[in-house]
C-alpha cells in the first residue's frame, strides 16, 4: 500500500463504530487465514499481501484502542 492509501484506510476506519471495526477485523483475519492456506499449498502469487493484511489488522486494532 502506498502512503496515501494507508492514510485513506485509517481515515475510513476512524469513521466506523466499534461493531463495524470488529466486523472489519474479522474479515481481515479470514482473509489472512485464506492467504496462509494458499501460501502453504503453493498457490499464492502475491506473497506481500500477507504482510499487508497483517498490518491492516494492526491498524484496525490501533483504531479500536484509540476509541476506548
From Swiss-Prot:
Coiled-coil spans in chain: none
Listed CDD domains: Ribosomal_L29_HIP
GO molecular function terms listed in the Swiss-Prot or TrEMBL record: structural constituent of ribosome
Matching PROSITE patterns: RIBOSOMAL_L29
GO cellular component terms listed in the entry, alphabetical order: cytosolic large ribosomal subunit
Entry's Gene Ontology BP terms: translation
Keyword Transmembrane helix in annotation: no
Record keywords, A-Z: Ribonucleoprotein, Ribosomal protein
Gene3D superfamilies: 1.10.287.310
HAMAP family named in the record: Ribosomal_uL29
Family, as annotated: Belongs to the universal ribosomal protein uL29 family.
UniProt-recorded name of the protein: Large ribosomal subunit protein uL29
Record organism: Streptococcus pyogenes serotype M1
Lineage: Bacteria, Bacillati, Bacillota, Bacilli, Lactobacillales
Gene label: rpmC
